Structure formats: C-alpha cells, structure tokens
C-alpha cells in the first residue's frame, strides 16, 4: 500500500523529533527520500537525498537515486552527471553504463560523450541488441558518410541474429534509401526461407512495399523477364503471408484494403502466365489462398458486425471455400525451407485443410447446402454479390481479379475424411506445431464421426520422442512421451469445445459456425497451456536459451503430474473419463500389438484414477481447484446415475487389456461377469479367434468338436447383441462396430456351423485334407466373414489377425525372388573374383575359414553392413577386411531374418542336448528352408524313419529338423549301448526320441575338406539355405536382428545393503609428488554385508563404472577435515580398488557442508555398528607365533596342492578315453581327441576337474583358439574337445570346447598354450601362483568372453602410438585416437593388416590391409611420424584415408617401418612373420613344477611290468609332448602301481581309508587319464619291454605323436573300438589293484581312491588353502596398516625432536643475549672477566678471538686509570 504525502511527513517529523544530532538527521535522509519517492513527491525526495549526500558523499547508491529523480524530471544532463559519479564510485554497475549511453544518445547524438559511453557499454555487453540500436543511432546521424559503416554493422548483426526482424527491415530500408532496390529484393528473396520472418507482420509489410517499388521502378524494366517473373512470385507469396497475419491482428477495414491490394497483384500477374513455370504454379496456389482468405474475411465481418445476416455471409463464404478447395495442388517445387520441405506443397496442404474443414463445418446439419450454394452463387450474379461484400471501392469490377475470374465451373465436391487427415499433416508442418492450430484442428475433428489423427500430428513434430514411457510415476521431463502430449491436446480441445458451446448457446444462429476460421478465431487455449506447450517444444528440440533451461524444466515437470493424474492433479473426473474412453477406442482400432498395448494400458491407468473419484461423487461433489491446467465445466459433471455405467466401462477396459496381453481366460471371465453388448462383442471375437486357431491345421474329431463349441458360443453372443439392439436402440451406440458388421459376422458363423453339421470342412471320408487347409489359409473364402483390422484388436503377439494370412503368398514370392537374386549376385561375385587380380579390394582371398560345424552359413557380401547381433552391444556391425562373416554370424545362429514360426518352441535345453553340426545337418530353433512346398516334398531315402516324426514334431511346436545324408554327426556307439551301469549325466529324458544317422563317423572334418571348395556356388547355396524359413500357419513377425542373450550383471554388491550413497569427488594423496590427485567423480556408497555384517566403502566412476575406492570400514579409521575446506573429509585405508591391497590416503569432497556433515555422521554410525559385531578384522590376528604357523602351514598345503593339481591335469600326457555305454540320454565320455601340436606351441590340455553343462552348443572360443594346426586337423581339434561340469542334474548334455584364449595374441609365441579355466593354467602361470596374491574385496563377475576378430591372427608388432587422419575439407591433420597400433597376420591366408583401437573405449581408429603398393613416408619436420594412404574400414565402410602415426621414440618408429616392410614381403611369399614381441628368445621353464616332476619320478622309480605289444602305439599316442624350441620334458609311462610317496602330496590327505581308484569312466576303473592300472597281459615282445623299462627317460618325438593321431582318425569304427578296448579294458575284464608300498621304503600310507573322492579331497584342500590365503592376506593388510602407523609415529617423533632442538637453540640464544648485555653494561673488573669463559664457550671463539676479547677488557680497565693520572 502506497503512503500519501501527509503520512510520510508525519513519520519524518516523528523520527526527526527523536533524533537530536544534525548528522544523524542527515544520515536518515536516504530513507526519507525513498519514502517521498514512493509518494511521488520528487522535489522533497531530492531535498533529503542531497542532505544525505552532504554527509555521505561516496555512497554510489545515493548518487544513482538522485540521478533517477533527475531522469524523472527529464533533466538529462544532471541525471547523466549523477550516474557518472555513481559509476566512478562503483565501477561494477554495468547496467548504469548502458543507461548513461542511452540517455546521451537520446539527448544529443552528436555529443562526443555518447560515442565514448556507447563503446564502453559495448565492451560490457557484447552482442546486445540495445548496443546495436545505439550504434545505429550514432551512424544515422552521420548521414551518407556513415552508410558504409552502418551497412557493415547491420551485416555483422545479421550474422549473429539472422532471425531479428528489426535488423532485416533496417537493412532493406538502407538498400531502398541508397536506391539499391535489386539488393533489397535479393535480400527479401533469401529471407523468405526464414520461418521467424515469414510469421512477422512488419517484415511482410516491408517485403510487399519493397517488391512493389521494385516492379514499378525503371530498374525492373531494364532487367530480363525471368527476374520480373521471380519478383512477382515473391510478391504473391508475401501477400499471402501478410493477408494471413492481418486477418489475425488488424480490423476489418484494413483487411479489406489489403485483400483489394492482393486482388490487384493477382490481376497484374495473370496477364503474364504461360507454361508450367514457378510463377504459374504460385499464381494458381495464391488464387486458392485468395478465395480462402476472402471466405475467412466474410465470417470475420459477421463476427464483428451488428444485425448480421449469417445465412448470406455463410453462403458466400462456402462459395469461396469451395473454389479454394477445388484449386489443384502444385506439381512443381518452388523452393525449400529450412527443413527441406517444399514451400508450395505445405501451403497447399494448409489451404486444403482449412477450406475442407470449413466446408464441413458450414454444411453440418444442412442437407444439400453446398448444392444450393453452387446453384445460387456460381454465376455472374453471385460473383458480383461477392465483390460488393468484400470491396468497398468504386473501381470497375472488370479490372479486378475477383470480378473477372471464371467461377462457373465449380463442382459440388464435399471433402473426404481420409483426404482431410492427409492434408492436416502437411498443414501442421506449415504452422510449425502451433498449439492454436493444433487445437483448431482438434475442434474440427471433434464434430466429425472419425477420431482425429493426433498421433500422426505429433509424430510429424517430434520424430524421436518415444510413444509411451515405462515411468508413469515420475515427473522428470526426460520421461515425456507422445501419449503425454496426445492427452494434453485432448484436454485442450475438450475444454475449448465446452467453452465454445457455452458461448454459443445464448445467441447462436444455425448458419453461424461453432468455430470460426483459423486466422480469425480467438485464442483457443489458455496462457498456462500455451506456455507449457512452448516449454515442451523448446526442451525437446533443444532450443533453450542459456540460463532459462532450469525454469523450463520446472514448468514442464509441474504439469506432467497433472497429465498423468499423479498426486493432487486437480482434474475434472469427466475429463479423465474422456481420456480413458478415447485411448481405449483409439487402441482398439490399431493393427499394431504394441500400439494397442500402450493405448489401452494408458486407458486403464486413467480408469484406475477415476474409480476412486466415482465413489466420492456418490457422497458429495469434488471441489474445483483455484487455477487448474484444464478448466472445470459443471455442464459435464458426472451424475450419480452415470456412475454404474462408467464403472462397467472401466472393467471392460481392464478385460480388454488382459486379452491384449494374452491372458485370454482372465479376459473371458471378466467379460462374462459384465452383462453388456460390448462384453458380448468381445467374447464373440475371442471365441471366434479360438475357432480360427484350431481350423489352421487338420482337425481330429476332438478338435473338430472343440471348434464347433467355440463357434456355437460365438453365435450365441452375436444373437444376444442383435436382440439387445432391437429392443433398445441406445445400446447400439455403445457397440465399437456397426450393427451390420455383427449381422455379417453372424451369417459367416452360421455358415461354418452348417459345414460342420455336414461332416466337417476338414475331415471328410476319414482322410485329412492337408492341401485344402493350406489353400484355405492363403486365400480365404469370399463368403466367410473376415474381420477388418480396424474393428478388432490383437490378443497377444503370437495371434495376428486373419488378414495377415492373405499376405503370406506375396511374402513367400518376394522371399523366393530375393533368394534368387542373392544367388545370382554370389555367382557373379564368384566369377569376378576368379578373374580379378590378387590385390582386389576388399574381397581378396578372404573366403570362409575352416570353422566348426554348427555355423549357419555365411554372407558373401564383403564390406556390406551385417545386421546380426554379436557379443557386443552394437546391433549393426560392418564387416572389416579381416573379419570373416561366418564368425560374425555365429552368435546369431537362431536369428530369423525374414519371418519365423511362432510355434517353434524347441530350445537346446528342452531335448537335453545341443550338438554343433554343419549347415546341412539338423538345426535347433530355425525352421527348414523353403515354404509350404517344402511340406509336400518327397522325403529323402535316408530320412524315411524320421519323416513322420518331423510332421508330428512340427505340429507340437518343436522345430526340430534332423539333417539329410550329409549330416556328419552320429551316436552310433551310444545308441547301441545296452549297459545300464556306468557313469551317467542326469536322468533319462522322456522327451528324447533317439538319434539319427547311426553308424556314420562320429566327427568328421567337414570344413577341412571344404577348403578347396570354398569358392563354389554350391556352398553359397547351402549357406543361403540357413536363412530360409518355413511358413507356419500362425505367423509371427520378429525383428530381423535378434539381440544377444542378456548377460546378468554381477557387480559384487548383490548380498550387500546400501546404507549410504552420495555423489562426491574423490581424491588420492600421491606421496611421490606430495599433492592430492583427483581419482574420480561418482557415488560414494557404504555397503553392509547381510551375512557377516562387515561394512565397506565403495565408489565407482560415472559412466565407465571403474572402481576408484573399495575398502573395509574399521573401528580404527577416523575422519579428518581437509585443511581449507569444510566440505571435504580425509582418511587412510587399505584400498583394493586396483586389485591389490594398497595403503591409500583418500579424501572425499561434497557439494555442500551439510552433505559432508551427513557423511561424517553416517560413517561414525557405521563404526558404532561394527562394535556390535564379533571382530573379524585383521588386527585380531597379530600374534607372531600363530601367524608364523599359519603361514608355514599355508605354504606347505599350497605347494602340495600345486603338485597334486599338476599331476591330475597332467599337461604332458594326451588323453584318449572310450565312450561310456549309457541308457537314455546319459551320454558320457569323449571320442577320439586328437591334437596336432604347432611348431611353436604345446598342445592343449584337457582339464577334467571342472565339468561344464551349459546350454551353448559351442563357445565362441572355437574360432579364437590359440592351437594352430594343419588344415586337415584343425576342425577336429577345435570341435572334439569336451568339458563336463560338476553338475549332473537333469539331461542337459552339452558338447563344448574346452579351449579358451588365456593370453593375449602378442604372448602366444613366448609361452605355452594354456587351456582351461583361469585358475588352473599350470603351464604358463606357475610363477604367478608362487607369488603372493591379494584378492580384491569385491569379487569380479564371471568373465564374458569377448570376440574381437583378432583371434586367428598373430601380433607381429604392437606399440602405443598416436594416430592422425587428414581432413580434406579443412586441410589439416586431425587426431583420431591414442592406443596400441598393431600389425596382425592371419594364420590361414597370411594376410597382414593394421589395427588400432582407442584406449578404454576400444573404438577402432584404424583397420586396413597392408598391400604391396603401400609405402610409409616420413612427415616433414619429424622422423618419428610415418604417413601412408589406405582404404580404411575403421568406421565400418570402405573409405580412402591419409593416415599418420606418431611414436614416442625413434627406435620404435624405425621398428614399425621395418616390420611394415617385412609384412609386405611375407604376404607376397605367403609365409608367417616372426613377431616383434618374440624376436629375442627367452629361456622357458619346464611346464611342470619341480616338485611335481619329483613326485612322478618317485612314483615311477620301480620297474613296471611289461606292456603288451599291441598297446605300444596307444601308449605312445597317450603321451603328450610339448614341442618347445628349447627342450622336451620327460615322457612318463604309467605304472600299474600308484604310490603316493612325496611328503608334499601326503600332507594333502588326512584319511587313510583305502578305496578303489576310478575316475568317472565305468570302463576305466583301472585307468587314470591314459595310465593303465590293470594287470598287463604277458608278452615276449622285447621291444615293448625296453620301451616300458626306459620309464621316464624315454622321449617321444612330436612327429610320432602326430602320426599316431592321424592314424587314429583314419581308422574305421571297428578298429577304433579295438584300440579303445585295448587301452581301456572293459569292466568285466578289469582287475582292481591296490597301491602297494615298495619294500625298501618305510611303511607309508596306501591310497585307493575313486575319482569322486579325489575331486572332493581336492575341493576341500582348495577351500582350506583359500581360507589360509585369506588369513595371510588379512595379516598382510594388518601389517601394512601397522607399518603405516609406525611411519606416522616416526615422522611425529622427528617433528618433536626438531621442535625441541629449536626450543633449545632459542633458549641458548636468549641466555647468550643476557650474558652479552651483562658483559657490556658491567663495570670493568673481575666480574666482566668471569663472563669471558661463558662467551668463549657459547660462541666457540678461536684463540686469537679470545685474546682480542681479553685485550678489549684490559684496555677498558686501563683507560680509567690513565684518565685519572
């Protein structure tokens, strides 16, 4: 409330009366001046502020306030002087500088001070529009001299703000003032593409004036005719825009004048028409706009006039709209806007949309209205009446366009709704998503019977916005979706419609349209709605102004709660019901399953919000909020009588959602409980669909009866609907379909029931009519009722509507044509590749590699993107030159590229086995290639026994198709097995039907034989067959690319509870440089283990999720504040973030001090929790004696465990075991495991202490195996290695490769091949396991093997470097990444390529082949940079790049050049390169530990019995020899007696119970991994005896092993069985031998164990060792903590000592000072002499200095005596 002058005077008098001091009275003058300023007494305000300034002259606020008072009095000079003084006192007042500049420019522009202050303000406000206007004023006053500067100023401002209307108009005016009309026209032409300018009334007025002036000028006459036509085109477009804007903002008289001017422009352009050029097309379109605006002006005149004849005006307006609607759309493109859209096309859509809707609105409820209008006014009389109504001038009609136009050829053409919907989409683009336009369109559709296409409108505006969100409970702006915006538009249209109805009910003529034309109608939405819509558009299109983003987000966030009916939404229940009904109706009309699910799901959401409100309405009304987003209208309030009906609608919607989700039984139950025609209709649909599903196959009598029952129920429900409709006509309105559709469907059902009564359509004469049923699926009978897609909804993803079956034949035909084209292209590529040169890019010599069976075929389009899911997250993968498509396609073996059968339920786990086979063999999860013709194909001769099974299996939904004659997998021995004993995996599977192809070879090297056939067209056809799918009766559309199986994310935090989590910045103190270093930004968590109660602190970096803090919380830890900050805490802990325990000093910085204090409280609370838990921290174990014993015991058990594991895994022995004979699916054992060692690597090891039953048929490690064998032996090596897991439950039998890449490719040539699990790679990790190892606190998740494409390649060079790419556009080098650059050579085809990936992200930044024509060149100015040109595939596509790589050292750069040249040479010679990392040969240790060798030598010390001669070859082949380059280890032949003698091994076991020794194989009770324990048969063969006697000293050469392996492969089945039985005697012939103690040795422990017992012993020992290792680690961590504390104590002691020394020295100095003062002031004599020793001692004077000091003392004694004398 403003105070009056009298109030202020009374208050001032009272205050001054209480203030005796004059200075204090003056000090209150500022406050008094503000009070008088509020009372508008400016003179009194100046008086008091001046008194204040007299005592406080340096107060800038007072001077500014005085300047404001002078400015109000328009005393500019004094105001500027006060402001200037204020700025001098406080220079930070930027706005005051701008104020001074504006005042000076306003007062006198020529004043030199104005220029100074404008330049000063420009430095403070760069790019400000206000500064531009001031500069413009300064330059305007210079006249013609300043035009050039003004032009430069405007151009620079346009560059910054091209949408500024004032700047554009100013430029055009400058052109016009300087008579440069041509430049002005050119600028107008260019600026027409700017949407912001086209929507400005001032700009369009300027354009019209400029173009008219140009056309009338002499310059136009001198120019060519095309320029004149282009200017006329721009003029007509500008008139159309100006007319639209004038209709919306100006009065009727101005509209008439502008329309008349538009008329004259059209008339002048009419005479120059000819041809099909831009002017003709624009003229025709502008003619339509002219008549549309004429009709809108007529209705506007009726709105603003008095005593208006609405009938006459509406008839003339309808005539105008008819002419506008019948103007054809332009056929040529005029120009494109910013979005690349045709301008004329958008304007035509807008014209047709507005005209069409207005025609429907004017003719609504009036029969033959348009026909009467055409008959009455489509003539000269009507034309004259129209002219008189629009134009008030007395100009002759013949000279005007409207008076001379021919309007007599108008047809009575009413717009079609489908055409209008299409025009609306284009009109929305023209208006750029204006909420006013969208609301107007919604109001037009609100009166039409069809639903508006709001979804299509919004998709045009927001292309990338999701349709629905899964987070309806949140209000985050990021969660906004299309459905939210659709609901918002529905609400705006709904409330606008109700508001218009209320206004029109009082005074409304039948000829007056409910909603006026778009240009003349008032604002249809509220300001709140408009601001929210604009904020959403700004956020989605990311056009927010900096600094305004937070405000927009808050605005959007607030209204999302209302749109989703969350919390206190304040929505009227009637609006919620309207939303729910609209969404349910729209969803039911969609053909998309997901569209139905989203729409009906949102409808259910709103119904659930309405139901509680309906219960409240029964008791009382719902209060209306004060300022709602959507206004409440009492005319639509829900009455109590309507509540039951709405509740029924809600439950029907719930049931429909159940049906859509596939819960058919729940939906049927819900529908049956509701007695309504809508529920009857839905029940009829459900039962009819069930009957159709049964009809799809040949019917048995039971299925035929079931189908008849469903059809009977359908008929009954349809009859109920018809009966209810006849009795009550209002019921028919509730039906989602017309009543005629119900009757048509009833007739169809009745016809089907009659067919069943005649004997059934599918079962006649006791025979199945397969052909008829198939024909029925592809071509439905014309008499049968087929439900329209718009009349129904899908019930589940697996149940598509019947109309999709009509497309099967078309899709099949297209698939066949595509396959034929693919084959032709493959043959063409094959022929071209044969004739091409060796170095053709990129298909050179990259045929399919030899890969294991089971790969589903390869794509032969090299270089094309492959849309298959690999192991990585990327879906689209481009094939690089060194990647073969077979490897990429491997993980997507069960992807259906085109269509898949929805009935296929077969998985590898269902039948209990998963076996890798060739592409010709049987397949799992993929239907057999071919279409319906495949079903009628004649079965092959070899598969006669399986054909019937195939048909039955297909009917039951198992897509199992066993292979043809080329199948290479058989289970001959297993199928013939009759023994029920022995080792079995799992129980018998009742679903298992046996195996096919018995008697054939168990495993064969298919791809080894295919090496010479890789480029034949037949193989391409086989590969393509893998993608062919079989049409099923029930079609299911799946995505082309199937995502990989979801890998469960294991973080190590699963069993822990989050007690605290907060975002912080973590620092680590670096002791070397003595400073804090940032470690990461992320959430710091305190986790509590639910099992043992331990607490730990964990933090991961954002995005990369790298652990940057991970340590236990102990009671000894304490937080200390970081000096200089109240938001940071520091502490010390033994951290495991890098994997090893390391004492770290950490600090966490929080956003606010409150968060830091909260963290401290939580930390201390956690420490108090630890006091209640039994202490398990390491400091309890600090007992030197006990610790020493624990360490000793752990080391002993660790050593023994290693020796025992080494013997069991037996890396130097080959394993060959006989297949077990099992029953059912219990198949165990391995077939001929044959491995050919490479020249540089040892053979792989088979580890039998880990068993693996997994679903995967073949691991990706097959293609990445480090075993490099010959082409003939490579496939068996990779295929036939088995791993069996410990779990034997169920019948999930899996053949899986045990090979895994244990080291990087760069290390393969300097270490032996390590195969198996990570913890048991004995050969290469012996030294690593001897060292101490600290496990992290958080266990890592299981390793997910990643395929990089570099598995079958050796690394010949690898070093860190920085790579650059030359950008031709900007003409400079650009950095592409930093990482390891590698030169890789393929083992198979010897091709060499360069690969480089970025650090951390591993993104490819170089990937190309090395070709002979490539050469490295030094970059000018440096010798460490190499430059070359190559066709690179780093971005997935072939692209010629200029690359440069820079190394840190010159030696590395030279080495890269050397290896590069060697690679080209080796590639030409087809030879392998010696890798750079293995040039220096390093001595290799024995792959077996010394203790393990001692154990074996001790075991084999006694001479064994003689081995039978027939077994020599097998015994030799069982010995695995490591083909290292240095020395080969001793080959040991197993003795029949097995004695544990080594003390290290003996300590492992504690039980001396003797049991038979067997390892899992029923026939190998007397054998262990190839070592025979059975009684050997006597033989006189001396040769074999010598071999056996040599024992461990005998050596077997690798070539002999290879020969024996190959001979094993080539043997027949009979010989194979003989050999296996020879080396592994059967159970009947085996004799159990005990392990006897040697006579010469002291009595030792005898061991006879089974394999299970040994495995159990090994497990318990491993657990014990792990426990002891854990204790060791705790001791080590405690010791580290104690050592750190000792260091801290020592440093503290040293600090104290230094302080003591300083204090002592300070005391000594003080004492010396006192002594010297006494010496100086004492009188000469004996007292002074007594101080001399003290001074000499403290100052450590030399003898000479002592003498001088004594002489000084003596002189001082003699001087007084001399003076007295």
From Swiss-Prot:
The modification Phosphothreonine is found at residue 19. PROSITE patterns: GRIP, RANBD1, TPR, TPR_REGION. Residues 1594-1617 have a biased composition (Basic and acidic residues). It comes from the Eukaryota. Residues 1231-1244, 1580-1593 have a biased composition (Polar residues). Residues 1036-1172, 1333-1469 form the RanBD1 domain. InterPro entries: GCC2_Rab_bind, GRIP_dom, PH-like_dom_sf, Ran_bind_dom, RanBP1-like, TPR-like_helical_dom_sf, TPR_rpt. Residues 778-797 have a biased composition (Low complexity). GO terms for molecular function: small GTPase binding. Residues 1317-1329 have a biased composition (Acidic residues). Residues 1702-1752 form the GRIP domain. The modification Phosphoserine is found at residue 21. TPR repeats lie at residues 26-59, 60-93, 648-681. Keywords: Phosphoprotein, Repeat, TPR repeat. Residues 760-804, 1216-1247, 1306-1330, 1580-1621, 1746-1765 are annotated as: Disordered. GO terms for cellular component: cytoplasm; nuclear pore. GO terms for biological process: NLS-bearing protein import into nucleus. Interacts with GTP-bound ARL1. One of the 8 copies of RANBP2 clustered close to the chromosome 2 centromere. This is RANBP2-like and GRIP domain-containing protein 8. It comes from Homo sapiens.
């Amino acid at each position: 409330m403003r105070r009056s002058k009298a109030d202020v005077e009374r208050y001032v008098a009272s205050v001054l009366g209480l203030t005796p001091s004059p200075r204090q009275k003056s000090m209150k003058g500022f406050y008094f001046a503000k009070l008088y300023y509020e009372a508008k007494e400016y003179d009194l305000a100046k008086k008091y502020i001046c008194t204040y300034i007299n005592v406080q002259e340096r107060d800038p606020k007072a001077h500014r306030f005085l300047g404001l008072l002078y400015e109000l009095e328009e005393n500019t000079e004094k105001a500027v002087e006060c402001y200037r003084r204020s700025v001098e006192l406080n220079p930070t007042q930027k706005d005051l500088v701008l104020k001074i500049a504006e005042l000076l420019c306003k007062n006198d522009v020529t004043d030199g001070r104005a220029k100074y202050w404008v330049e000063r303000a420009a430095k403070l406000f760069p790019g400000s529009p206000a500064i531009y206007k001031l500069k413009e004023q300064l330059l305007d006053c210079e006249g013609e001299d300043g035009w050039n500067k003004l032009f430069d100023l405007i151009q620079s401002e346009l560059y910054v703000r091209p949408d500024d209307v004032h700047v554009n108009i100013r430029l055009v005016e400058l052109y016009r003032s300087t008579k440069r009309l041509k430049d002005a026209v050119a600028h107008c032409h260019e600026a027409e593409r700017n949407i912001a300018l086209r929507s400005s009334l001032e700009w369009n007025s300027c354009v019209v004036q400029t173009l008219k002036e140009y056309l009338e000028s002499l310059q136009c006459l001198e120019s060519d005719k095309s320029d004149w036509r282009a200017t006329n085109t721009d003029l007509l477009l500008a008139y159309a825009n100006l007319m639209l804007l004038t209709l919306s903002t100006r009065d009727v008289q101005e509209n008439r004048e502008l329309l008349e001017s538009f008329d004259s422009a059209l008339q002048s352009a009419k005479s120059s028409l000819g041809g099909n050029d831009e002017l003709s097309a624009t003229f025709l379109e502008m003619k339509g706009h002219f008549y549309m605006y004429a009709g809108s002006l007529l209705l506007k005149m009726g709105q603003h006039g008095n005593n208006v004849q609405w009938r006459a005006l509406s008839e003339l307006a309808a005539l105008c709209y008819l002419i506008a609607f019948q103007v054809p759309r332009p056929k040529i493109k005029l120009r494109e806007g910013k979005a690349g859209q045709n301008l004329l096309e958008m304007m035509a859509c807008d014209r047709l949309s507005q005209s069409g809707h207005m025609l429907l609105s004017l003719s609504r409820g009036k029969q033959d209205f348009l026909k009467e209008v055409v008959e009455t006014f489509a003539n000269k009389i009507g034309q004259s009446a129209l002219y008189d109504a629009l134009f008030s001038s007395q100009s002759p009609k013949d000279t005007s366009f409207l008076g001379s136009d021919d309007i007599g050829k108008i047809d009575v053409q009413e717009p079609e709704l489908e055409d209008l919907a299409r025009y609306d989409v284009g009109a929305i683009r023209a208006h750029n998503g204006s909420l006013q336009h969208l609301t107007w369109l919604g109001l037009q559709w609100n009166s039409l019977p069809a639903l508006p296409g709001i979804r299509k409108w919004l998709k045009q505006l927001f292309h990338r916005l999701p349709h629905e969100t899964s987070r309806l409970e949140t209000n985050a702006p990021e969660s906004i979706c299309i459905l939210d915006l659709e609901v918002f538009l529905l609400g705006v249209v709904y409330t606008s419609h109700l508001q218009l109805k209320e206004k029109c009910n009082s005074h409304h003529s039948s000829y007056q349209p409910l909603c006026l034309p778009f240009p003349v109608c008032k604002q249809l939405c509220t300001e709140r709605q408009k601001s929210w819509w604009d904020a959403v558009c700004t956020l989605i299109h990311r056009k927010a102004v900096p600094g305004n983003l937070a405000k927009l987000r808050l605005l959007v966030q607030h209204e999302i709660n209302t749109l989703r009916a969350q919390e206190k939404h304040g929505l009227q229940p009637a609006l919620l019901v309207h939303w729910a009904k609209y969404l349910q109706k729209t969803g039911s009309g969609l053909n998309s399953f997901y569209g139905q699910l989203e729409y009906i799901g949102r409808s259910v959401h709103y119904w659930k919000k309405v139901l509680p409100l309906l219960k409240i309405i029964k008791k009382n009304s719902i209060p209306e909020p004060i300022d709602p987003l959507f206004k409440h209208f009492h005319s639509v309030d829900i009455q109590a009588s309507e509540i039951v009906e709405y509740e029924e609608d809600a439950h029907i919607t719930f049931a429909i959602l159940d049906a859509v989700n596939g819960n058919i039984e729940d939906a049927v139950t819900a529908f049956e409980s509701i007695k309504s025609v809508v529920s009857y209709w839905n029940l009829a649909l459900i039962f009819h669909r069930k009957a159709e599903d049964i009809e799809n196959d040949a019917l048995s009598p039971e299925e035929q009866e079931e189908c008849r029952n469903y059809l009977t129920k359908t008929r009954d429900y349809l009859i109920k609907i018809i009966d209810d409709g006849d009795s009550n006509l209002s019921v028919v309105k509730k039906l989602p379909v017309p009543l005629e559709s119900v009757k048509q469907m009833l007739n169809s059902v009745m016809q089907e029931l009659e067919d069943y009564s005649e004997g059934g359509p599918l079962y006649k004469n006791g025979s199945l009519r397969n052909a008829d049923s198939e024909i029925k699926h592809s071509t439905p009978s014309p008499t049968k009722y087929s439900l329209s897609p718009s009349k129904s909804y899908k019930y589940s993803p697996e149940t598509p509507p019947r109309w999709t079956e009509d497309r099967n034949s078309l899709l099949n035909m297209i698939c066949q044509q595509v396959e034929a084209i693919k084959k032709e292209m493959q043959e063409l590529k094959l022929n071209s590749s044969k004739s091409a040169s060796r170095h053709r890019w990129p298909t050179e010599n990259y045929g399919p590699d030899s890969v294991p069976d089971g790969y589903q075929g390869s794509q032969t389009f090299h270089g094309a993107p492959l849309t298959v899911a690999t192991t990585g997250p990327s879906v689209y993968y481009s094939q690089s030159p060194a990647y073969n498509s077979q490897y990429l396609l491997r993980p997507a073996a069960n992807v259906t590229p085109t269509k898949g059968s929805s009935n296929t339920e077969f998985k590898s786990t269902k039948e209990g086995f998963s076996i890798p086979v060739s592409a010709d063999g049987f397949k799992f999860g993929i239907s057999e290639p071919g279409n319906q013709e495949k079903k009628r194909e004649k079965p092959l001769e070899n598969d006669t026994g399986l054909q019937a099974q195939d048909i039955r299996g297909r009917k039951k939904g198992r897509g199992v198709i066993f292979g043809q004659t080329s199948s290479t997998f058989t289970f001959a021995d297993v199928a013939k097995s009759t023994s029920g004993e022995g080792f079995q995996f799992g129980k018998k599977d009742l679903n298992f039907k046996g195996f096919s192809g018995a008697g054939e070879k168990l495993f064969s090297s298919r791809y080894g034989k295919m090496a010479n056939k890789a480029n034949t067209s037949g193989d391409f056809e086989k590969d393509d067959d893998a993608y062919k799918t079989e049409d099923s009766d029930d079609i299911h559309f799946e995505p082309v690319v199937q995502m990989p199986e979801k890998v469960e994310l294991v973080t190590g935090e699963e069993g822990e509870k989050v007690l605290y989590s907060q975002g912080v910045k973590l620092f680590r103190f670096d002791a070397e440089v003595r400073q804090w270093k940032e470690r990461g930004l992320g959430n710091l968590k305190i986790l509590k283990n639910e099992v043992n109660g331990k607490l730990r602190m964990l933090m991961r970096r954002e995005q990369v999720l790298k652990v940057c803090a991970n340590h236990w919380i102990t009671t000894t830890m304490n937080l200390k504040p970081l000096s200089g900050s109240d938001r940071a805490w520091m502490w010390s802990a033994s951290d495991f973030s890098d994997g090893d325990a390391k004492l770290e000093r950490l600090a966490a910085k929080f956003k606010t001090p409150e968060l830091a204090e909260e963290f401290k409280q939580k930390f201390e609370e956690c420490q108090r929790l630890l006091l209640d838990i039994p202490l398990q921290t390491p400091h309890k174990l600090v007992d030197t004696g006990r610790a020493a014993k624990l360490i000793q015991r752990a080391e002993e058990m660790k050593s023994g465990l290693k020796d025992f594991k080494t013997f069991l895994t037996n890396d130097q022995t080959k394993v060959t075991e006989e297949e077990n004979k099992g029953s059912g699916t219990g198949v165990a054992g391995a077939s001929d495991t044959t491995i050919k060692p490479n020249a540089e690597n040892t053979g792989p090891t088979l580890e039998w202490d880990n068993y693996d039953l997994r679903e995967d048929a073949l691991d990706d490690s097959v293609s990445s195996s480090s075993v490099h064998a010959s082409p003939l032996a490579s496939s068996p090596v990779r295929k036939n290695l088995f791993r069996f897991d410990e779990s034997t439950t169920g019948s999930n039998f899996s053949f899986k490769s045990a090979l895994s890449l244990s080291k990087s490719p760069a290390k393969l040539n300097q270490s032996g091949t390590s195969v198996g699990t990570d913890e048991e790679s004995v050969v290469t990790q012996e030294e690593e396991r001897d060292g101490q190892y600290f496990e992290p606190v958080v266990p890592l998740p299981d390793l997910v093997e990643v395929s990089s494409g570099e598995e079958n390649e050796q690394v010949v060079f690898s070093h860190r470097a920085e790579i650059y790419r030359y950008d031709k556009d900007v003409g400079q080098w650009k950095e592409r990444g930093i990482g390891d650059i590698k030169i890789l050579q393929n083992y198979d085809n010897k091709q060499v390529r360069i690969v480089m990936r970025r650090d951390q992200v591993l993104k490819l930044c170089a990937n190309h082949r090395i070709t002979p024509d490539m050469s490295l060149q030094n970059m000018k100015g440096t010798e460490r940079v190499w430059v070359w040109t190559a066709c690179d595939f780093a971005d997935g596509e072939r692209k010629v790049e200029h690359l440069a790589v820079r190394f840190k050292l010159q030696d590395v750069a030279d080495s890269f050049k050397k290896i590069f040249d060697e690679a080209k040479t080796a590639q030409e010679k087809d030879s392998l390169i010696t890798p750079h990392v293995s040039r220096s040969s390093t001595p290799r240790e024995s792959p077996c530990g010394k203790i393990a060798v001692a154990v074996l030598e001790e075991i084999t010390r006694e001479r064994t019995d003689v081995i039978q001669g027939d077994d020599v070859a097998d015994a030799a082949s069982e010995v695995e020899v490591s083909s290292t380059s240095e020395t080969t280890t001793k080959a040991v032949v197993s003795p029949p007696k097995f004695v544990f003698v080594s003390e290290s091994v003996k300590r492992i076991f504690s039980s001396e119970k003797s049991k038979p020794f067997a390892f899992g194989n029923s026939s190998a009770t007397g054998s262990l991994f190839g070592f025979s324990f059975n009684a050997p048969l006597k033989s006189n063969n001396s040769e074999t005896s010598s071999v056996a006697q040599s024992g461990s000293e005998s050596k077997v050469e690798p070539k002999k092993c290879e020969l024996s392996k190959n001979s094993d492969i080539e043997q027949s089945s009979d010989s194979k069985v003989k050999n296996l039985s020879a080396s592994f005697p059967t159970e009947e012939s085996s004799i159990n031998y005990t392990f006897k103690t040697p006579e010469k040795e002291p009595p030792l422990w005898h061991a006879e164990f089974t394999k299970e017992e040994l495995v159990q012993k090994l497990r318990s020992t491993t657990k014990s060792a792990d426990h002891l290792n854990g204790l060791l680690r705790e001791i080590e961590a405690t010791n580290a903590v104690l050592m750190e504390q000792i260091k801290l104590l020592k440093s503290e002691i040293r600090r104290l000592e230094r302080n003591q020394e300083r204090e002592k020295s300070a005391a000594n100095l003080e004492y010396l000072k006192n002594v010297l003062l006494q010496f100086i002031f004492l009188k000469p004599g004996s007292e002074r002499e007594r101080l001399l020793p003290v001074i000499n001692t403290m100052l450590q004077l030399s003898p000479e200095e002592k003498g001088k000091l004594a002489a000084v003392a003596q002189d001082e004694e003699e001087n007084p005596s001399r003076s007295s004398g």
